[in-house]
Structure formats: C-alpha cells, structure tokens
Amino acid sequence: MAKRDYYEILGVSKNATKEEIKKAYRKLSKKYHPDVNKEPDAAEKFKEIKEAYEVLSDDQKRAHYDQFGQADPNQGFGGFRSDDFDLGGFSGFGGFEDIFNTFFGGGRRRNPNAPRAGADLQYTMTLTFEEAAFGKETDIEIPSEETCNTCHGTGAKPGTKPETCPHCHGAGQISTEQSTPFGRIVNRRTCPYCGGTGQYIKEKCTTCGGTGRVKRRKKIHVKIPAGIDDGQQLRVAGQGERGLTVGRREIYILSFMWSRMSFLNVTAMIFIAKCRLRLRKLRLGMKSKSRPFTGKLKLKIPAGTQTGTRLRLKGKGVPNVRGYGYGDQHVIVRVVTPTKLTEKQKQLLREFDQLGGSSMHHEPHDRFFDKVKKAFKPES
C-alpha cells in the first residue's frame, strides 16, 4: 500500500514555509497524541504525522523527497543489481559488468555479518508548564532491543556455537545456473537457510530463539532543561539501542507541554500573567503584587491604567533553555467587576459618569457603564 503524501498528511501546500510546517505538526501531533486521543488509529496517525514532519522539516530530506518522492533513487530499476548475475559467459565482452554497475545501481551486496548500528529511540514526554519552565529530572522506561545475556548475541545455546551453513557452505548465497541463447547466466540469491549469514545455528538459544537479541524495558535517568519549548526535541546520547558489535545510538525525547494554570500563556521565553484589580485602584494608581509561577512580585500600576493594558517586567519570565538569561514577564491588567453595590455607591457612580473625564473624548459613544461591562466581558 502506497504511503500518503507528506504534505497532505500535514495539510500544507508544497510551497509551505518551515514555520507553517512546524505549526501544522504541533497542532496535529497534539490532536492525535496517544496520551490524549483514545481512538484506535490515533497512534498510527501520530506516527505518520511524525514521519512527515521529520522529512519536511529537514531541508536536505525535503529536497530529496520533492525530487524523488518516497522511493529511494539509489535503488535503480526495482533494485536490480549486477551481483545477481554472473556474466562469465561473455568472455569477449569484459566491460559488461562495469556497464551493469553503472546503470543498475552497482555496489556489492551488503555483508550480513558486518557490524550494524542499533536504532535511535524516541520517547514522548508530557510536561506541565512549571516543569517546562524550571526543568525536571525523572526516570523513564523505554522499550529496546538488547543483546541476549544468555548467548551473548551469538543466538546459539550456551556451550555450542554457530556452524558453517551446509547449504551455502558459508558463502551466504546460493547460485543457480541458467542457459540462454546468449550464454550461461548464474543467478545468485540470499541463502534462505541461514539468511545470508553463512552460519547455521543447530541448537538455538532458548532465551532469544536464535536471534541474539531480546526485547527489554530499560530505565534511564534524564534531565529536562529549564525553558524547554513545546515540541522541542532533546537528545540523550549513547542510550539508544545497542547494535551488533558496535556502540549504542541515541534517544530523542519529544516534549509536549500542557499548562494546568488557566491564567498563563507562554510564547518562547515570554511569560504572560493576568492581574485582576478593583476599579478604584486603576483610576488612582497603586502598587500591586503579581503572582507568577516564581512567586510574588511587586508591580507598580500607573494611575489611569486601562483594562487590557500589558505591563512588562524585564527578566522575570522563563529561563533560556541554552542556559543564559531570562525572558520577560508581561502582566495583563483586568478590572474586577463589583457585584454588589449599595444605593450610595450607585449614586456616586452616576455622579462620576456625569462628571465625565478626558478618556470620554476618545470614545464618545460609550457610556461609563458600557465600558465597565465591556471590560468585564468574558474572554473568548
């Protein structure tokens, strides 16, 4: 079954910018994240979205994809290789193998016994706003394929060892001859008995079933840096899967941030809080205390401050994930609507409204109480 187009998966055009691709990825990955979306196909969609983003967010991979699609251009004509044929029957045409190497991908068949690196692992971590802002140390468990401790990766039962495959005699390939009008052609294919390794395991390890690998859940300790952004990827070197006779690969931790604090919003390193004050305090000015995630901070409210005004506290925001400096905190002022007024208070407000003020000239069509209602209208 052919894979869907990566641009179609993310819902962006082929001319989309990296920022548009990143925005679409964040939106879709949150929607289909298995921890949030309980639909049966959510995990598969999430994997599909991640794969599309990994390609389209990388300039080199994206250019390759735009040119060749999802097929590997190095495969030539359906993976046809010169190694599959012995052209020895054409003794008078010594250059034919070179020609086939040129046109059909060339290259020798990969040695199945050659060292192979393990796989990179990915772990998705959900963070609260506080954890993303201040960092977090925690233990995580990841599924991983590791070397079997019973046979030490040989796949053979302890006390025995792999033998030379009796079918291919250790070559890893089986040859069949075919006569044609053009001469003799020898077709080589991977030995189905040993899988191309050239070795035959007569008594397999009962722990790993002869594969030399076992699946385990591995616990590792990770440190999430303060100031990590939503959707940012953290690399943990040397903790991925162990390869065959080579070292470990990496783990990539993908962060998703879910704020439990309804009055907070974060953009990059900017921290935004809402400060609710009574009407008289805004009219006359005051010193207030903002309650951000770092604790109480003193804040000077100028006289005549309007609801919706944003006040900046420099260096009181989220730490920089790279370890230097802090962002700014922005406090948005909101007026607290009085719910119960005495007759005297109502009369004073009417008198205040009749007196007017300089602000009335900027909005001649809004009465005072209309402004108050507008100021306290719930935000959508």
From Swiss-Prot:
This protein's record includes keyword Metal-binding: yes
HAMAP family for this protein: DnaJ
Domain notes for this protein: The J domain is necessary and sufficient to stimulate DnaK ATPase activity. Zinc center 1 plays an important role in the autonomous, DnaK-independent chaperone activity of DnaJ. Zinc center 2 is essential for interaction with DnaK and for DnaJ activity.
Function statement: Participates actively in the response to hyperosmotic and heat shock by preventing the aggregation of stress-denatured proteins and by disaggregating proteins, also in an autonomous, DnaK-independent fashion. Unfolded proteins bind initially to DnaJ; upon interaction with the DnaJ-bound protein, DnaK hydrolyzes its bound ATP, resulting in the formation of a stable complex. GrpE releases ADP from DnaK; ATP binding to DnaK triggers the release of the substrate protein, thus completing the reaction cycle.
Any one Gene Ontology BP term: chaperone cofactor-dependent protein refolding
Superkingdom of source: Bacteria
Quaternary structure and interacting proteins, as annotated: Homodimer.
Cofactor: Zn(2+)
Name assigned to this protein: Chaperone protein DnaJ
Location(s) in or outside the cell: Cytoplasm
CXXCXGXG motif repeat residues: 148-155, 165-172, 191-198, 205-212
Domain J, first and last residues per copy: 5-69
Zinc fingers (CR-type), renumbered ranges: 135-217
Protein residues bound to Zn(2+) 1: 148, 151, 205, 208
